[in-house]
């Protein structure tokens, strides 16, 4: 929002340097991005009155005699198509500085002396977007009613003597998107009540309210007011209004459109003016668009309307995209005589989505989406009507149509003096706080410690006690808050047992060569429950940034897969990533957080070189990494079991659930081909992951691995070759071997797996190496032989395995 310092002075008695004021406003919470002085760097630019204008034969040039307030007129050669005798124009004299620090000198053009330059607005620093269309390709001509004299500087007449404060407004401070709102804000800072005058409107035309049948859905437009102004004369706006518009970054159009923009800047209430001929059938309807309806907007852009767009129609066809922009078919034109003014409150969410959907964000839509002051609907309508009567010779017809007129009660927030002082660390009295609230335009009730504060409707951002704390703090002055040491209970320092365990796990994983990734906690609803054995109700965000960040994650693998995609798209194929973080669910109607650890592997364990071939990462490599982690934190191998699982997003035959003492703590496996195929960057890659619930296993952690003395007695090894049915797993076999191997069974290792044409159909060959050890005495062959016989017999009976 570009705020004119001179316009602010209509509301407040300001004598402070504009740049100092900008600094003061910034310190209270509304950032002033810049303070610009349009006349800065310009000199010797004056009003000139063209006395004579002759065409120079054979050229597009004109030789002009111009009165610039000196004893004699000066001669200037000008090539603008709209230069003519009798006009008041902008003249840069000899030695003048114009935009771009360009210096103007006397010279000759086509051999004819020229003692200066007749300027267009762009040449003295105006942006193209604010220059009126009629002057875009020529010089600027002062309106006939402009109070200017030859020889006086142009800066005041054009509003260039002003200072423009650029309010960098956050979405919660929509109240400052108007001059009145800015005046309330600045007034609170300088402790002065702004002079905001009521509108007194006289109706001098016949009643018109029976001319139009208006149908409005209150959900789409809770307030919808109309007035009719007859016999308007379309023309140029007075110069005072034009300069206020272009200093706010808005191009003057004509006296009707300019009034609607001016009132929007003044009150924050977007307005629209229709040519009354648009509604010749006497109908106006506010509704949702129908499928395949189209509308050509005022910017000549044709849009295909969405069924969620709010539109205004003439009873049949659309004439405006509500809250965004009017239609070309209802535009006020040069021959317009009767105008219908609209002042309304539209559903802000719908307006925002329409503006975004059609890539057409406007000054009006930005105000509706942030929230307008419902109390200004009537004032804005009457102000626009008053200005059209004064500046366009219009007749204000009696009556207004209030198709919808919902009311919004001011919010009331309760707090206490002691609470505000406690949060701010101040010792302000009740009287001091009441004074601050009065400066802000809030009313206060209550007694003693209690504060009952009524918030005006222009302030949408105040709803809870913490908001009142902020208001008191910023108006009192953050610079005035005393610096104090925080009061904390004494502790012995150090990490808690859980923090220590979590850090230890992270250190171990990093020691395995993995790099830490940090991903978003927010994801899409679909991704939130992927890679999860038993998805729980998700935690949804009420006001998401977009649909892909609307849900709190239930797993960490999703974020690692996104990180892998990002890296692989940039030719980084060898990946070993991990993330330790929280996941969320809404089970049993409570919001729950769990600490998880996840890892992702892709590529090779070692790159190929002259010493060895490369080896691709597979399930067993990742399982080995996880086994080493469990051992390092004191979880025994025999307590861990891997069971085949079907999990969404995971490979159906290369995925296992991880169980510790029969309790599920996570999963391990390969991403499903369906997942990697959908992402171009991941296509063709084999990606392995695991994820474990750290909260579940933290109670199982010990201080670390315990060292054992080397055995004093020799071990005995025996090989065991088995013909195994395909549906029997290694885990089942090892469990039976451990069950029957006796107390001296020390270790089991798989040494070979084979499945081929030489093996019986439906079977596979697995060979094991079993190690037996008596740590207190020499182990005999007889003891080992007995154990082997028992193992073989049990495998044959329980799992239908043949010993080869």
From Swiss-Prot:
Gene this chain is encoded by: pheT
Location of the FDX-ACB domain: 711-804
Organism: Lactobacillus johnsonii (strain CNCM I-12250 / La1 / NCC 533)
Residues binding Mg(2+): 461, 467, 470-471
Catalyzed reactions per annotation: tRNA(Phe) + L-phenylalanine + ATP = L-phenylalanyl-tRNA(Phe) + AMP + diphosphate + H(+)
Gene Ontology molecular function: ATP binding; catalytic activity, acting on a protein; magnesium ion binding; phenylalanine-tRNA ligase activity; transferase activity; tRNA binding
Domain tRNA-binding per the UniProt entry, residue ranges: 39-155
Cofactors that this protein relies on: Mg(2+)
Family (UniProt): Belongs to the phenylalanyl-tRNA synthetase beta subunit family. Type 1 subfamily.
Gene Ontology biological process terms, A to Z: phenylalanyl-tRNA aminoacylation
A Pfam match: FDX-ACB
Cysteine-cysteine disulfides: none
Keywords of the record: Aminoacyl-tRNA synthetase, ATP-binding, Cytoplasm, Ligase, Magnesium, Metal-binding, Nucleotide-binding, Protein biosynthesis, RNA-binding, tRNA-binding
Domain B5: 408-483
Binding partners and assembly: Tetramer of two alpha and two beta subunits.
Name used for this protein in its record: Phenylalanine--tRNA ligase beta subunit
Cofactor binding comment, as recorded: Binds 2 magnesium ions per tetramer.
InterPro entries, alphabetized: aa-tRNA-synth_II/BPL/LPL, B3/B4_tRNA-bd, DNA-bd_dom_put_sf, Fdx_antiC-bd, Fdx_antiC-bd_sf, NA-bd_OB-fold, Phe-tRNA-ligase_IIc_bsu, Phe-tRNA-ligase_IIc_bsu_bact
GO cellular component: phenylalanine-tRNA ligase complex
Protein location: Cytoplasm
Enzyme class: ligase
EC number: 6.1.1.20
Family annotation (SUPFAM superfamilies): Anticodon-binding domain of PheRS, Class II aaRS and biotin synthetases, Nucleic acid-binding proteins, PheT/TilS domain, Putative DNA-binding domain
């Amino acid at each position: 929002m570009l705020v004119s310092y001179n316009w602010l002075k209509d509301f407040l008695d300001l004598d402070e340097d504009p740049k100092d004021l900008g600094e003061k406003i910034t310190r209270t919470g509304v950032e002033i991005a810049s303070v610009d002085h349009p006349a800065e760097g310009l000199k010797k630019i004056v009003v000139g009155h063209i006395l004579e204008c002759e065409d120079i034969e054979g050229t597009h040039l004109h030789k002009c005699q111009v009165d610039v307030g000196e004893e004699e007129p000066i001669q200037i050669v000008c090539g603008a198509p709209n230069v003519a005798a009798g006009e008041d124009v902008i003249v840069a004299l000899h030695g003048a500085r114009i935009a771009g620090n360009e210096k103007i000198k006397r010279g000759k053009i086509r051999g004819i002396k020229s003692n200066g330059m007749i300027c267009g607005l762009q040449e003295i620093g105006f942006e193209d977007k604010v220059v009126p269309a009629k002057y875009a390709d020529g010089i600027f001509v002062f309106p006939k009613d402009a109070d200017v004299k030859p020889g006086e500087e142009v800066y005041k007449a054009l509003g260039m003597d002003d200072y423009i404060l650029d309010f960098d407004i956050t979405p919660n401070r929509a109240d400052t998107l108007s001059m009145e709102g800015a005046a309330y804000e600045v007034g609170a800072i300088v402790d002065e009540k702004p002079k905001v005058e009521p509108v007194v409107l006289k109706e001098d035309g016949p009643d018109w309210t029976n001319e139009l049948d208006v149908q409005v859905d209150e959900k789409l437009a809770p307030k919808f007011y109309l007035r009719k102004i007859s016999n308007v004369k379309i023309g140029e706006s007075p110069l005072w209004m034009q300069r206020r518009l272009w200093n706010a970054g808005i191009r003057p159009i004509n006296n009707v459109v300019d009034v609607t923009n001016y009132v929007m800047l003044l009150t924050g209430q977007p307005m629209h003016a229709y040519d009354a001929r648009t509604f010749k059938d006497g109908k106006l309807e506010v509704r949702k668009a129908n499928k395949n309806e189209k509308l050509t907007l005022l910017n000549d852009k044709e849009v295909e309307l969405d069924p969620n767009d709010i539109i205004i129609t003439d009873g049949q066809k659309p004439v405006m995209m509500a809250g965004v922009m009017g239609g070309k078919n209802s535009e006020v034109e040069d021959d317009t005589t009767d105008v219908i003014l609209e002042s309304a409150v539209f559903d802000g969410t719908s307006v925002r989505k329409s503006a975004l959907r059609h890539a057409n964000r406007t000054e009006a839509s930005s105000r509706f989406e942030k929230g307008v002051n419902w109390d200004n609907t009537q004032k804005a309508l009457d102000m626009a009507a008053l200005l059209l009567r004064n500046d366009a010779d219009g007749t204000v017809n009696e009556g207004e149509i209030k198709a919808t007129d919902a009311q919004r009660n001011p919010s009331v927030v309760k707090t206490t003096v002691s609470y505000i002082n406690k949060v701010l660390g101040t010792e302000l009295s009740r009287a001091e706080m009441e004074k601050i609230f009065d400066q802000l335009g809030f009313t206060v009730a209550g007694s003693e410690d209690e504060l009952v504060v009524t918030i005006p409707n222009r302030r949408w951002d105040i709803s809870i006690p913490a908001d009142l704390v902020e208001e008191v703090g910023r108006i009192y002055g953050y610079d005035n808050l005393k610096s104090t040491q925080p009061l904390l209970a004494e502790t012995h320092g150090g990490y808690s047992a859980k923090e220590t365990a979590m850090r230890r796990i992270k250190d171990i994983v990093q020691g395995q060569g993995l790099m830490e990734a940090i991903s978003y906690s927010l994801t899409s609803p679909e991704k939130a429950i992927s890679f999860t054995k038993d998805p729980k109700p998700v935690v949804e965000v009420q006001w998401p940034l977009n649909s892909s960040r609307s849900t709190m994650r239930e797993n960490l693998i999703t974020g690692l897969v996104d990180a892998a995609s990002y890296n692989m798209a940039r030719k980084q194929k060898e990946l070993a990533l991990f993330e330790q973080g929280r996941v969320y669910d809404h089970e049993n109607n409570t919001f729950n957080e769990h600490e998880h650890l996840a890892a992702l592997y892709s590529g090779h364990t070692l790159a190929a070189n002259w010493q060895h071939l490369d080896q691709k990462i597979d399930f067993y490599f990742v399982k080995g990494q996880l086994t080493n982690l469990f051992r390092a934190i004191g979880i025994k191998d025999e307590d861990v079991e891997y069971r085949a699982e079907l999990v969404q997003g995971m490979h159906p035959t290369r995925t296992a659930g991880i169980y510790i003492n029969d309790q599920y703590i996570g999963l391990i496996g390969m991403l499903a081909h369906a997942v990697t195929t959908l992402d171009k960057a991941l296509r063709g890659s084999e990606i392995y992951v695991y994820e474990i619930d750290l909260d579940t296993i933290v109670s199982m952690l010990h201080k670390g691995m315990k060292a054992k003395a080397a055995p004093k007695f020799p071990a005995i090894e025996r090989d065991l070759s088995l013909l195994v049915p395909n549906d029997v797993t290694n885990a089942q076999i090892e469990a039976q071997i451990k069950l029957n191997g006796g107390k001296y069974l020390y270790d089991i290792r798989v040494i070979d797996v084979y499945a081929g044409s030489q093996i019986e159909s439906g079977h596979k060959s697995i060979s094991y190496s079993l190690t037996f050890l008596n740590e207190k005495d020499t182990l005999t062959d007889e003891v080992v032989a007995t154990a082997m016989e028992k193992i073989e017999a049990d495998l044959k009976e329980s799992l239908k395995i043949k010993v080869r």
